[in-house]
Amino acid sequence: MEITEKAPAKLNLFLDTPFNHPDGLPEWNMIMTSVDLADYVKIESIPGKMGIKVRTNTGFLPNDSRNLAYQAARILQEKYHVRAKVIIEIRKHIPVAAGLGGGSSDAAAVLRGLNKLWNLELSLEVLAKIGLEIDSDVPFCVYSRTAHVLGKGEKVIPLKKLPPMWVVIAKPKLSVSTPYILSKIEHKELQHSNIESILDAIEREDYTDICRYMGNVLEQVTGKEHPEVLKIKNRIKQYGADAAQMSGTGPTVFGVASKSSRAKHIVNSLKGFCHEVYLVRIL
């Protein structure tokens, strides 16, 4: 038995972290959305055998227990005592270590896929709770729709569908370690924004105000470590984006535009300056 699941990239339209919990994990206050840049995850289950095997089309990902998709399969096997060998093939299109949630989305795809293959009949809410054991982005990726995400990532509140917009994603030729960036955060020194303004703009489906109130507090941290990130952000704005910012802990920067012609102009202008550039839509 096998199934293929789509694993969309995520973007942070808004990201703040007001404090760390006693266990060291950040408290998140985020607005996340999914785009049509996606990995494709084929999952095969062979009854009666045991083991987990991960294959990818890139050499940049581990294929052992460090891989989040592997962890997703192992957790479901152990929780529900399923005796089956799982073979996971990941066709990567989302850049690795980019702040786009590729690993978390792959893990969420495995949770959804095995839930179907094994007839577990678990709700998305239950899968999201399991996903939190893997990574803070997995609960959101289980749903893969625009949402307000709080806590350690476990509170996923669905929001209205965003107005139509084009998104230009630009990844420089560098990778950023999320644990390292999080370790550099000094919460009291960060300039925190108010999420209520962009939540209200989304509720009103006001594209202009959504652009006005976007923000990512971690730009202040990653930008200090990697100035190239802020240079790309400024270029995207100069080329005509209505708004631009870093996603997650970076280094990927994205810009939004209401017209495809302007978005294509931004893409063409970035070529030769930025390592990877994608033109995508919000799901």
Curated annotation (Swiss-Prot):
Keyword Transmembrane in record: no
Gene3D superfamilies: 3.30.230.10, GHMP kinase, C-terminal domain
Catalytic activity: 4-CDP-2-C-methyl-D-erythritol + ATP = 4-CDP-2-C-methyl-D-erythritol 2-phosphate + ADP + H(+)
InterPro entries xrefs: GHMP_kinase_C_dom (IPR013750), GHMP_kinase_C_sf (IPR036554), GHMP_kinase_N_dom (IPR006204), IspE (IPR004424), Ribosomal_Su5_D2-typ_SF (IPR020568), Ribsml_uS5_D2-typ_fold_subgr (IPR014721)
GO biological process terms, semicolon-separated: isopentenyl diphosphate biosynthetic process, methylerythritol 4-phosphate pathway; terpenoid biosynthetic process
Domain of life: Bacteria
Its biological purpose: Catalyzes the phosphorylation of the position 2 hydroxy group of 4-diphosphocytidyl-2C-methyl-D-erythritol.
NCBIfam families: ispE
Listed name of the protein: 4-diphosphocytidyl-2-C-methyl-D-erythritol kinase
Protein's organism: Pediococcus pentosaceus (strain ATCC 25745 / CCUG 21536 / LMG 10740 / 183-1w)
Gene for this chain: ispE
